[in-house]
């Protein structure tokens, strides 16, 4: 690969990071939509790659019981998408449905987090620090806990809020280190 070709590719990647995908007329809406679309794409890739992994593990005859978090029911394989086995249109429908659901969850989390941090920065007079990240992470974590399961307890919501705040704050503090 030539150096000039490498520079062109790197310039394209850098311009993608700075440019917004949408112009909806307000910076808040632009930021939320941009974050939603980018994270939804990541969520879709993650869901498809996870299913591809389980397909390879099952096809190769590996024991997938020892992969990932321990199963509550010992001896049974626990798959995220139990309907995705076999060569049928039902299997493809389940893959598309679950990939869409995962994309929506990732997109909502990113859009919510991005919108809250933008709003907090505006309200606090342009200050963007770990406090904004902690509040946005906590609210996003709590919201995601309430949307991922029908039987979510208040302990799970609080735990997700604390985890979201901790991860977001750590990422904000570490971003200044690197």
Swiss-Prot record:
It is found in: Plastid, Chloroplast outer membrane. One of its GO terms (molecular function) is protein homodimerization activity. It comes from Arabidopsis thaliana. Induction: Regulated by ABI3 and ABI5. The gene is OEP162. It comes from the Eukaryota. GO terms for cellular component: chloroplast outer membrane; plastid outer membrane; pore complex. This is Outer envelope pore protein 16-2, chloroplastic. It is a multi-pass membrane protein. Keywords: Chloroplast, Ion transport, Membrane, Plastid, Plastid outer membrane, Porin, Transmembrane, Transmembrane beta strand, Transmembrane helix, Transport. Belongs to the Tim17/Tim22/Tim23 family. Plastid outer envelope porin OEP16 (TC 1.B.30) subfamily. The chain crosses the membrane at residues 103-119. It holds the Pfam family Tim17. InterPro entries: Tim23-like. Voltage-dependent high-conductance channel with a slight cation-selectivity; selective for amino acids but excludes triosephosphates or uncharged sugars. Non-essential amino acid-selective channel protein and translocation pore for NADPH:protochlorophyllide oxidoreductase A (PORA) and possibly PORB. Detected in pollen and seeds. Present in leaves and cotyledons. Homodimer and oligomers in membrane.
